[in-house]
Each structure stands twice: as structure tokens, then as C-alpha cells.
Amino acid sequence: MEDVDLGFLSQEKLDEKDYLDIECSRVGGAPLFIRKNDAAFLNESLENSFEFLMQLYAPKNSEISYHRILYIFINRDGDSQTAGWTRGVKVFREQARETDEIDFQLITSKVTKLIDSSEIEVDAEPKEENKKEIPEKLKNVKVDTENPSAEPYTKAKGDVSFLKFQKRLSRAPDQIMRYYHATSNEFPGLWCNNECIPSSIPNCACGAKRQLEFQILPTLISSMNIDHSAKNALDWGILSIYVCSASCDLANCGLAEELCWLQTFSEQGIIAPE
């Protein structure tokens, strides 16, 4: 059975003291790095158009990943958010052993205005019988009632996937991310469109396979400080984060870059039943 934890935004805002808590998974604020060298490298190499979106404290049960943080940076220009292995989202992994000397560094120059700082609270996904109201953002997807019989096979695929997506989110409409505890890609995650799912996942530079670790949902967009009506506003269906399955030690001597797959909603909309 698929084991999924959900992430929700806390109602309490964070301050700099909270930013210095390595175990605090959060959106917004300033990113905290385990090593000063990693912070300096990122500060110099990351393009100015990228803003800090979130960091997730996700240690693994191994010596080299006693401390393990995943960082997400996103390009504020929505036009850069292309479907597939997008270059508009940057993912980094940083790790340390319990015995390592920790040299924390907060990059205050990367404090983001994109989203207010908030801790990510985690809870297990409710059972299906606990489903609630569908989020307004997902209710407003275009419904095609003009020609329900046209291209039934092609459209049904996307529609079925989106309806499953709606149904799953209805269990906890305020969720902004989904974290998977699977040790392989046997459980493929949640998708809003059958037409844009990765069929081939690049391996890590260490040679190990990458696997889906968590997904960032479109429900987060409504909390972002952006002009939602702008032509190039940030938008996505699902951001799927693929990470080295071995949590290799490349992240113990620097930042290991991982991958993000961006899935968009189907442009065909939902077809009403006959």
C-alpha cells in the first residue's frame, strides 16, 4: 500500500530564529545550509531570476544522510516553467553525517518575496472516507460540454486522470505537497494529466536510479505573492521531485543537483458525461 505524508502550511509565520532550525521544513524565508561553502557556491552560481521556494528536512536511515535537506528554487518568470524536465525549477540535496562538524550558513540575500515564510506541517494522508470539499482552484478548470462525443478516447484519458487527481485531493484540500516513503518508483505518485508523465528517469551522477520523493501541488500557488492574472504568472499542475535513491555522498561534499518534472493540466478540460 502506498505510504504518503501530506504537507500543510502552518498559520504561524516564521522569524530568523526559526530559519536557524535545521529540522524546520518550510516555504519562504531564507535557506539554511549545512556548510558555508555550499551556501557561497549557490549564492554565486544561481541566476538572480531564481527565488527560494522551500526546503525540506528529510533524513534517511544511513550514516551519510543523518542530516539531509532538499532545497527548491524556482524561476519567477512563468514562461520558464516548461513541461517535462523543467529548467525553471532547481533542486539541490545537501547531507551530513552525525559526526560531521556543522557550519550552518543562512543566505539572507536569498530571502524571498515570492511567498511568506511558513513551516510545513506534516500529517498522514486521510483515508478516502474522510474526503472534503474540492479546492476552488481545481473546481474552476474548464468543462467542455459542447461536443462530448468528439475524440472520446484521447480526451477521456486526460479527464479520468484529472478526476482521480481531484478525488485524491478532496481527502485533504489544503495539502500543498505529498511525500512518498516508497523505496522505488513502484508507486508512481499523483498525476493530473495522463499525457505528461515521465517514461524515462535519468540516473544520479553516482549511477544510482532516481526515484520520486515528493510532489508540490498547485494549491501552493494561491499562497504566493504574485500577480495571478499576469500572462507569465507562475503556474503548474504538479512539480514532481526526483532524487537519488541511494542518497549518495555527492551531497556530503557539496550540493548534489536533482531533477524536477513539471506536469501541466490538460488543455482539453473535463468532458461532461452523456
From Swiss-Prot:
GO terms for cellular component: cytosol; nucleus. Disulfide bonds: none annotated. One of its GO terms (biological process) is maturation of SSU-rRNA. InterPro entries: PDCD2_C. Signal peptide: none annotated. It holds the Pfam family PDCD2_C. To mammalian protein PDCD2. This is Uncharacterized protein C13G6.09. It comes from Schizosaccharomyces pombe (strain 972 / ATCC 24843) (Fission yeast). The lineage of its organism: Eukaryota, Fungi, Dikarya, Ascomycota, Taphrinomycotina.
